[in-house]
């Protein structure tokens, strides 16, 4: 029998427990979403018909994961006693709005799981989710979580996400990428097929 000391705050132990708690939460539509309070982590899932997402469509594999903490939380300015308000709810609402603005996505094709967590532990949980699932909107198609850069900053290149999923009004003001949406979608298919080959355990259906 192993006599290795159990440390409940060890990275793998804690982060794994949070991820399991998140995945045990009910999956709910991204839109509409009832208001709730708190900071935490979330996972967004896709069940639509776009062919380049078919490997994960309708499966319990997130297309995107993220976190929401109060302003100043990343610098340690908000701790155990701070009331974060509705930051996690607002983040999910922002994502639903972004999806609703683009041409080739429908809000009804997205659902989410979210878990309210004490802000100090949120980043650890998000990091573990990213490592475990390698969501395509986090690892390849960057830009989903971007916001309007504001006047005077529109000379920057448009994101991969906004090139593949055109429609956010402010993104139209940015400089076009050289890579086409078709080229990006091909890379998405390659990425997801490789993920399925290399990480078959996350594609197994739950009992």
Where are these regions (language model features)?
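Boundary/linker segments flanking structured domains
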Residues: 1-63, 67-207
